[in-house]
From Swiss-Prot:
Listed GO CC annotations: membrane
Keywords, ordered alphabetically: Membrane, Transmembrane, Transmembrane helix
Higher taxonomy: Eukaryota, Fungi, Dikarya, Ascomycota, Saccharomycotina
Name recorded for this polypeptide: Putative uncharacterized protein YGR226C
Entry superkingdom: Eukaryota
Organism: Saccharomyces cerevisiae (strain ATCC 204508 / S288c) (Baker's yeast)
Something else known: Completely overlaps AMA1.
Length: 69
């Protein structure tokens, strides 16, 4: 039902403003790419398997204890 409501809204938008629909499509394409990049940056390693905790541990080994305050 929720999905149907969303589609209904999209069709209303499309009838009002096609440019807005194009923008939404573009946004939906860009956001996952940005999230992948962000995960890659936070992970701190090229294979992207690290977590934020791993990154903190690596940072602590390199620089000393990080001060987040």
């Amino acid at each position: 039902m929720c999905c149907f409501d969303t589609l209904h809204i999209f069709y209303n938008i499309r009838s009002i403003n096609p440019t807005l629909l194009n923008f939404i499509n573009y946004f939906l394409l860009i956001v996952p790419q940005f999230i992948k990049s962000y995960r890659f940056i936070v992970s701190g390693n090229a294979n992207c398997h690290g977590t934020w905790r791993d990154y903190c541990a690596q940072y602590t080994q390199r620089v000393g204890r990080p001060n987040f305050e």
